[in-house]
Amino acid sequence: VFESINVADITILIQSGARYKFGDLRIANDTRSQTLAERLAPFKTGDLYQASQLGLLNQRLKQTQYFRHVIVRPLVASSVDAVVPIDVILTHKPRDNFDLGMGVSSDVGPRFTGKWQRPWVNDSGHFAGAQIYVSSPEQYVSFDYKVPLEDAIHNYLSYQAGYQAQNDNDTSSHKWSISASRHWAVENSDWQRSAFLRLEQETFIQGAEPEKSTRLLTPGFTFSRLRSKGGVDINWGDKQTITAEFASE
C-alpha cells in the first residue's frame, strides 16, 4: 500500500487445480448416431476441456435434422485422471414426418401444401424429402435426397428433381428440372462451398402463339458464409452468398 499516493497493488493467487480434458463420447445403444456425433464433434479425446465446445456439438447435432431433442453434458463424476467422458442423449425424430396445410387467398384462391421428410433412410444417414403445392394458377412437386460424406452438415451430396406447372392469364407453362450438387467446407475457413449441375426443360404457350420449348444445362459454383456475434445470445449476424452460373441451351 502506498499511502502517500493512495494506491495499492493487489496480488491474486489462484490455484485452479488440474485442467480437465475431453474423454470419449458416450451414446447408449446407438451405433449410427455414435459415428455421426464423432464426425461432428469439434474436439477429440485428450483435447483440453472447453464448455463452449459442448454447446457447438449440441448445435451441430440439431442442425442435422435427425433428432427431436439433443442433450450434451459432461460426466464429471465419472472422470478419471481429469479426463471427462461426454454423455450425448438423443431423441430421434419419427421415421416419417409430415406437414400439411390448406388455405384460401384472394389472389390464388384455395391452396394446399404438403411436406414429407425421412431423416434416416439407412444407417449411413441418407436423408429424403418431398414437397407439393397445389393451387388454381400454380402446381409444383419436388423431391430431394441427401447423402452425407465426411459429415452431415458441411460435406455431402444432394440430388433434386421437380416439376412445376403455371397458368397465368394467357400463358401456360410446364417445367421439369433435375440437379446434383456437392457441398464441402475447407478446414480453417468459414466459407461453405458447393458445385452444382442443373438441367431444366420448359414448354410454354403464350396466347395464340405456337408451343415453344427450351432446355438449359447450367453448371455453377456457390460460396457462402454465416457470421454472428454474441455467443448464445446473438446480437449481430449476416449471411454472404456468391453464386456463378453458366448456362447452355
In which residue ranges do the predicted regions lie?
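Interfacial loop/beta elements and low-complexity acidic/Ser/Thr-rich segments
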Residues: V1, R19-D24, P210-K212
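Post-signal-peptide, soluble extracytosolic/periplasmic N-terminal scaffold domains
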Residues: V1-L13
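Conserved "repeat-terminator" motif of extracellular CCP/Sushi domains
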Residues: I10-R19, I86-P94
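A short, amphipathic beta-strand motif
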Residues: I12, G23-N29
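Extracytoplasmic/secreted envelope proteins and their assembly/folding machinery
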Residues: D24, Q34, E38, A51-N58
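Alpha-helix N-cap/helix-start motif at coil-to-helix transitions, marked by capping-box chemistry
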Residues: A28-T31, S213
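N-terminal periplasmic "start-of-domain" segments of outer-membrane beta-barrel proteins
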Residues: R32-G46
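Gram-negative/organellar outer-membrane beta-barrel architecture
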Residues: D47-A247
